[in-house]
């Protein structure tokens, strides 16, 4: 009997030990599982954080690209032509003369930025902007294709103090304008300029003096048959001819003084003289200092004063 009791007790002890061992094992497994789940959660959080960071970075890159695209504003060729006509914006052509003279928007302004490597042109444009473009109106820039020239001009205008929100590029530049019917012209006689005149009698009083310049824009043969003493001549008989306008422009730049008044003589005091004034405006002359002799060479007193030397 005693032996059975001892045996039974021993079996109970062994059983309890086994239970305890199983409990410890379960505890270890539970702890390991919890740790694994915690690690997985941490990994998920890290992945989420990484995704968020990547998304933020992508968003920043997208924003930067958008800002880069938005740094230049655009206007259509048709709107630029309309703006020049109704004076709702300054339409500024920045092409070099040889391209500009072959076709320009009527009533546009001209201040070249080409060749782009010529720093003196940027300086001149900065001065021009301060004197002519600082009135708060929008500015529409025309270059060859709506890219490099307009981009450089935009930078120059901003450096000159022009608000960037007022500066627009004509999309496609002169190439787009060529596709717009009637957008480009070589006719300058219909410009919206405040044409000024001088009476024939007053012009004759100034002949031979050093205070004014007399510019005869009649053709070579007509000029040779009779002209005012001391005058200089550049034919604009073919008023829409780019070559004639170029010759006039070069003479104005090289032989004439922009600080002195100019009296222009043409056949009748109309289109040829007006063309000359428009060209001289591009050459840097103040239109308030340019005068058309009334009635031109049709005036009998003017004819009587002609010389042939």
Residue ranges, per PLM feature:
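Structural scaffold elements adjacent to functional motifs in cytosolic proteins
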Residues: 91-93, 214-216
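Coiled-coil-like amphipathic alpha-helices with heptad-repeat character
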Residues: 17-20, 92
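Bacterial N-terminal signal peptides
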Residues: 9-17
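Rhodanese-like catalytic fold shared by cysteine-dependent sulfurtransferases
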Residues: 4-8, 20-36, 55-77, 81-86, ...
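Long, intrinsically disordered low-complexity tandem-repeat regions enriched in serine/threonine/proline
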Residues: 39-55, 63
């Amino acid at each position: 009997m005693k032996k059975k009791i001892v045996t039974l007790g021993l079996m109970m002890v062994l059983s309890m030990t086994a239970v305890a061992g199983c409990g410890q094992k379960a505890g270890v497994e539970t702890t390991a599982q919890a740790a694994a789940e915690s690690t997985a959660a941490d990994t998920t959080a890290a992945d989420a954080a990484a995704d968020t960071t990547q998304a933020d970075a992508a968003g920043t890159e997208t924003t930067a690209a958008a800002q880069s695209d938005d740094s230049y504003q655009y206007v259509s060729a048709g709107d630029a032509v309309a703006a020049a006509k109704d004076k709702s914006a300054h339409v500024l052509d920045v092409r070099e003369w040889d391209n500009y003279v072959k076709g320009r928007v009527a009533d546009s302004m001209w201040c070249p930025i080409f060749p782009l490597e010529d720093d003196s042109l940027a300086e001149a444009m900065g001065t021009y902007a301060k004197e002519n473009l600082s009135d708060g109106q929008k500015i529409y820039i025309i270059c060859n294709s709506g890219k490099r020239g307009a981009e450089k001009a935009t930078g120059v205008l901003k450096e000159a103090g022009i608000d960037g929100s007022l500066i627009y590029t004509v999309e496609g530049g002169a190439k787009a304008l060529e596709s717009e019917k009637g957008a480009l012209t070589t006719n300058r006689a219909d410009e919206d300029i405040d044409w000024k005149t001088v009476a024939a009698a007053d012009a004759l009083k100034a002949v031979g003096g050093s205070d004014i310049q007399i510019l005869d824009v009649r053709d070579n043969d007509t000029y040779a048959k009779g002209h005012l003493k001391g005058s200089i001549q550049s034919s604009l008989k073919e008023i829409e001819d780019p070559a004639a306008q170029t010759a006039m422009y070069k003479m104005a730049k090289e032989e004439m003084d922009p600080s002195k008044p100019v009296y222009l003589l043409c056949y009748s005091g109309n289109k040829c003289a007006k063309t000359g004034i428009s060209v001289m405006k591009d050459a840097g002359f103040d239109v308030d200092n340019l005068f058309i002799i009334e009635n031109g060479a049709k005036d009998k007193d003017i004819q009587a004063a002609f010389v042939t030397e």
